[in-house]
Regions:
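Bacterial Sec-dependent N-terminal signal peptides
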Residues: 1-31
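Domain-level detector of nuclease and nuclease-like folds
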Residues: 102-113, 117-270
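N-terminal module-boundary/linker segments of secreted carbohydrate-active enzymes
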Residues: 27-89
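Short clusters of hydrophobic/aromatic residues that line enzyme substrate/ligand-binding pockets
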Residues: 82, 257, 274, 301
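Short, flexible beta-strand-to-coil junctions
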Residues: 83-89, 199-201, 338-340
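Low-complexity, Pro/Thr/Ser/Gly/Ala-rich linker/spacer regions in secreted
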Residues: 28-30, 268-280
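Short, His- and charge-rich active-site/binding loops that engage polyanionic ligands
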Residues: 86-111
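C-terminal outer-membrane/trafficking sorting elements
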Residues: 277-351
Length: 351
């Protein structure tokens, strides 16, 4: 890495994420679809969105196979499997609709099945959640089985890694130390917005669900923080927007967080008690080999460093006070985020 005289940190509020990782809304909801939600925030917004998307048209479990052909299709009648796809490269295997549908499987690449990203055991397998396409995806059967009913989260040291880089292992996120499943960075936002859809479509119905990540009708704090982070760092893609439109054609409702991803913060920023521009004071400086992070008396947490595409480049535990973290990257602008029990702090920096 060449020496540069003007390496410096750019202090910024959390609201800068929106501009820094700008989300372009490709999906086009019908005119007036969200009129009753405009101008609201917090729980009133969530309730208004619930009333808009409630009562969707349900399909049968068997009909999911054909539905996937319009919601999750690549060119050539191929399955868009987020547990095996590699957007920036060549996937290890690609399934054909119908031909490669599970049956049985013994390893990755055998067949695809129906993945409840929000596991069915978490809502007792009840309808209409059981066939709600906004959280159901076609995925490799073997990887689906490995994921099992584990929550989504950020993995520290992986116990198992799929061929596209999805991981299973102990959770790195503050507040939980069990096993989690981590999809690749390119699809984290897709799954996060699926979860926020579930928290909105089934608002008022979740209090009796045995979901380990749901408490008092909402995501528990550690999982909520992960989902908010993933929503921010993997912006809505044309693929996700096209899927929103395809599901709308079948179910006659939409995922509002694909159409308007900023509504995640408008609702759950307040629930988390973390306004967009708040968090423990953080000062970050870089040198030739790493990052010096000063956080005063803030609690220990986890440092994440992202590039402008939202890819995670570094995940590291961080202590209170002053920490030094080894880091190296090409010249450019990066985003540092610290999540701790105190909240989250975000700062852009030039490397």
């Amino acid at each position: 890495m060449s020496f540069r005289m003007n390496r410096y940190a750019l202090r910024g509020a959390f609201s800068g994420i929106v501009a820094f990782l700008a989300v372009v809304a490709f999906a086009q909801p019908p005119a007036g679809y969200y009129n009753s939600a405009e101008g609201l925030s917090g729980q009133p917004l969530r309730i208004a969105l619930h009333n808009i998307i409630d009562g969707h048209t349900s399909i049968t479990y068997a009909q999911l196979w054909s539905a996937f052909q319009s919601t999750d299709a690549k060119p050539g009648n191929k399955v868009w499997d987020m547990y095996s796809d590699i957007p920036s490269g060549t996937p290890p295997y690609v399934y054909t609709f119908g031909t490669d549908q599970c049956g049985g499987y013994n390893s990755e690449g055998d067949c695809y099945n129906r993945e409840h990203s929000f596991p069915q055991s978490w809502f007792n397998g009840d309808s209409p959640m059981y066939t709600d396409l906004f959280h159901l995806y076609p995925t490799d059967g073997f990887v689906n089985n490995k994921r099992d009913n584990f929550p989504y989260g950020n993995v520290g040291s992986a116990d198992w890694t799929s061929q596209n880089g999805s991981k299973l292992g102990l959770c790195l996120d503050p507040g939980y130390n069990g096993t989690v499943f981590e999809p690749i960075d390119a699809y984290k936002g897709d799954f996060a917005r699926s979860y926020f859809y579930m928290m909105t479509r089934y608002y008022g119905e979740m209090s009796g669900w045995p979901a380990p990540v749901v408490q008092n009708g909402d995501l528990i704090p550690w999982e909520m923080a992960v989902m908010v982070q993933w929503n921010d760092l993997d912006p809505v893609s044309p693929k996700e927007s096209a899927r929103n439109n395809a599901v709308y054609a079948i179910q006659h409702n939409r995922n509002p967080y694909i159409d308007r991803p900023e509504w995640v913060h408008a609702i759950w920023g307040a629930i988390l008690g973390v306004p967009e521009n708040a968090g423990p004071e953080m000062s970050l400086q870089s040198n030739a080999s790493g990052l010096h992070v000063e956080r005063g008396t803030a609690a220990a947490g986890t440092l994440f460093v992202y590039d402008m595409a939202g890819r995670t480049l570094l995940t590291s535990p961080i202590s209170s006070g002053r920490s030094y973290i080894a880091f190296s990257a090409p010249d450019g602008i990066y985003l540092a985020e610290v999540i701790s029990p105190d909240g989250r702090s975000v700062q852009r920096f030039v490397w």
